[in-house]
Amino acid sequence: MPQALPATIVATHLERIRRSVPLTHVITNDVVTGFTANVLLALGAAPAMITAPEEAGSFAAIASVLSVNVGTLTSAQAATIRIAVQSANQAGTPWVLDPVAAGVLPYRTELCRELLQQHPAAIRGNASEIMALAGQAAAGKGVDSANQSDQAIEAAQVLAKSSGAIVAVTGEIDYITDGERVVSIKAGDPLMTRVTGTGCALSSVVAAFIAGCEEKDRLDAVASACAVMAIAGQRAAAKAKGPGSFVPAFLDNLYLLDAVTIAEALA
């Protein structure tokens, strides 16, 4: 049975991020780079979008955390990802995988399955992506899921156990698991799906939240990342007229989040 996450835990992890300002190495897709950087800055992290293969390994070794997203994958980016992940592992830098459209396109699916063997600290995806990586039948529409998040809870648990990662399957309700315990986050707003990048940015926020976090606390950290994004989205949508006004309102609400607003949203 999924558990709710106490608001105090979310607030504690958010305060830790703002205090520590984790250097977050982001290798993401071309569509969302700027938005992702702004989301991280609004929350208090320090994004660095280092993508050159000549630099990615060196930077992953000194970063607080690495976030990998395969959304607009090319062979050159795949090489960069492999270099960065190997360097991160050698340096003890935790890293997060966002397996965009895994299970839909063979090339990226093969790369994601290869990366599963490289010990990601967390995996964040939609239901279809998580089900595909867990070896279950899934229905995806390009980068979008044709499965509901609750349909992927079992797959997320299987994937968490096989990979050793915390797995977050996101949708109308987010489910986060370490293979045994399952936490659910019910917040957010449908307007979040009408702008590009909220899911991809979430994966980098997950990375920032696990930076400097003890392994035993990673489940709560990942769930807290999902919670702050959902809460900010919900609050922004309440005042936005549409996608155009939603984005700046969303960034503002990430910046303004505090223990009181978190408690109100999760009450």
Curated annotation (Swiss-Prot):
Sorted UniProt keywords:
ATP-binding, Kinase, Magnesium, Metal-binding, Nucleotide-binding, Thiamine biosynthesis, Transferase
Q: Which GO terms describe its biological process?
A: thiamine biosynthetic process; thiamine diphosphate biosynthetic process
Q: Where does substrate bind?
A: 49, 197
Residues the record lists as binding ATP: 124, 170
Identify the metabolic or biological route this protein is part of.
Answer: Cofactor biosynthesis; thiamine diphosphate biosynthesis; 4-methyl-5-(2-phosphoethyl)-thiazole from 5-(2-hydroxyethyl)-4-methylthiazole: step 1/1
Pfam families of this UniProt entry? HK
Q: Which CDD domains does the UniProt entry name for this protein?
A: THZ_kinase
For this chain, the annotated S-S bridges are none
User: What cofactor is this protein dependent on?
Assistant: Mg(2+)
Gene Ontology terms, MF aspect: ATP binding; hydroxyethylthiazole kinase activity; magnesium ion binding
Q: Give, as one word, the top-level EC class.
A: transferase
Superkingdom of the source? Bacteria
Q: Which family does it belong to?
A: Belongs to the Thz kinase family.
* Protein name as catalogued: Hydroxyethylthiazole kinase
